[in-house]
Design a protein with these regions (language model features):
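Residues at the starts of beta-strands that form the adenosine-phosphate
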Residues: 1, 25-27, 111
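N-terminal Rossmann NAD(P)H-binding glycine-rich loop of SDR-like oxidoreductase domains
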Residues: 2-24
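Active-site loop/turn elements of alpha/beta-hydrolase fold enzymes
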Residues: 32, 78, 117
Length: 118
């Protein structure tokens, strides 16, 4: 199982498309699904599941979840809005979420790949 955060963004959607091209379909896409205009980026891709970031945090990032089926985390999810003024949101979204993903990967020996256009 591969997790791709930021799957609706430029890098994430192209990554999912390339993985699909290589025959990989067991992908969980994670993004802020309240931004419906971004869903067009991922519409042509095949995902096993598409999750809102909040649902992902409340599910996969909980201590009581098993993670042995996850082999890779491609972390492309971040707020790239240079006009965003909400410091609390930026810290939660760009720092704390990344930290929790990295801790999950480290604890479970999951390959962690990070890229951002922000």
């Amino acid at each position: 199982m591969i997790i791709v955060t930021g799957c609706n963004g430029f890098i994430g959607s192209n990554l999912v498309a390339k993985l699909n091209e290589l025959g990989v379909k067991d992908i969980i896409g994670v993004d802020d699904l309240s931004k419906k205009d971004n869903l067009i980026n991922i519409a042509h891709c095949e995902l096993q599941e598409l999750l809102d970031i909040k649902d992902f945090e409340n599910g996969y990032l909980q201590e009581n979840q098993t993670h042995e089926h996850i082999t890779h985390i491609f972390h492309q999810g971040a707020c790239s809005d240079t006009l965003e003024w909400d410091a609390e949101y930026m810290m939660k979204n760009n720092y704390s979420f990344s930290q929790r993903l990295l801790e999950l990967a480290e604890k479970n020996s999951i390959a962690f790949i990070y890229a951002s256009s922000a």
